């Protein structure tokens, strides 16, 4: 069963958190859920070059809080926070309420090459540039290994290299224990649009096992060849406070 179900949905409340954190009545729930979907689609479409890994949405009374995990926070923040104001206006326009209070927090992804969505996005970009899929997968695996992940699985489906018959190819490096609920599995999907049709991309990244309230176990000497990474940036929007 662990190989069929969505790894994120299976681990909600165990090693994964909900992407939308709010409660609503049965009457307003569908509208708010569709609103979240529109916000995410708007952000990924307009700021695709920012390498946005995840969008977390929370609601408190009339306030909307949006947290963006990105590989390039400077693209979102802009000069003196001008990008944040533009993003806030875009979200207000998307939800159809210019007076809605929107608070935006931008968090930098610590290990870009160890993030499943960013890896899937990289693979999609390479495939759209007509790079051979085997070479693309090999390069993605090497990048993930340098980031120190414990295991990785990549699957690509469609008309690979322009073949007449669609097929599925996959590769796995290290451990990817999909049946272990305490395993921290980062899962993402992406679609690559090519001249021969669309290619489906799935990426599973095993980051360690979570025991109780402990952080995921990181392999010893995960990245000894790389110098110490700089502290991840975080921009917290306080423009709506007091």
UniProtKB/Swiss-Prot annotation:
CDD domains: KH-II_30S_S3
Keywords: Ribonucleoprotein, Ribosomal protein, RNA-binding, rRNA-binding
Domain of life of the organism encoding this protein: Bacteria
Gene Ontology biological process: translation
Annotated ranges, domain KH type-2: 39-110
Quaternary organization: Part of the 30S ribosomal subunit. Forms a tight complex with proteins S10 and S14.
Family the entry assigns: Belongs to the universal ribosomal protein uS3 family.
Name under which the protein is recorded: Small ribosomal subunit protein uS3
Organism, scientific name: Parasynechococcus marenigrum (strain WH8102)
């Amino acid at each position: 069963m662990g190989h069929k179900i969505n790894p994120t949905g299976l681990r909600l409340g165990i090693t994964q958190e909900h992407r939308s954190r709010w409660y609503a009545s049965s009457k307003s729930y569908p509208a708010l859920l569709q609103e979240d979907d529109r916000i995410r689609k708007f952000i990924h479409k307009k700021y695709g070059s920012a390498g946005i890994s995840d969008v977390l949405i929370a609601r408190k009374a009339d306030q909307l809080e949006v947290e963006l995990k990105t590989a390039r926070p400077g693209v979102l923040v802009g000069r003196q926070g001008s990008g944040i104001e533009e993003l806030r206006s875009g979200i207000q326009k998307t939800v159809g309420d210019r007076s809605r209070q929107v608070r935006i927090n931008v968090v930098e992804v610590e290990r870009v090459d160890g993030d499943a969505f960013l890896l899937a996005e990289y693979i999609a970009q390479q495939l759209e540039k007509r790079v051979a899929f085997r070479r693309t997968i090999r390069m993605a695996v090497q990048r993930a290994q340098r980031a120190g992940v414990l295991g990785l699985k990549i699957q690509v489906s469609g008309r690979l290299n322009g073949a007449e018959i669609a097929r599925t190819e996959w590769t796995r490096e290290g451990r990817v224990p999909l049946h272990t609920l305490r395993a921290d599995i980062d899962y993402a999907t992406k679609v690559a649009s090519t001249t021969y049709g669309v290619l489906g991309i799935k990426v599973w990244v095993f980051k360690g096992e979570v025991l109780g309230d402990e952080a995921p176990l990181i392999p010893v000497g995960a990245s000894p060849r790389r110098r110490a990474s700089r502290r991840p940036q975080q921009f917290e929007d306080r423009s709506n406070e007091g």
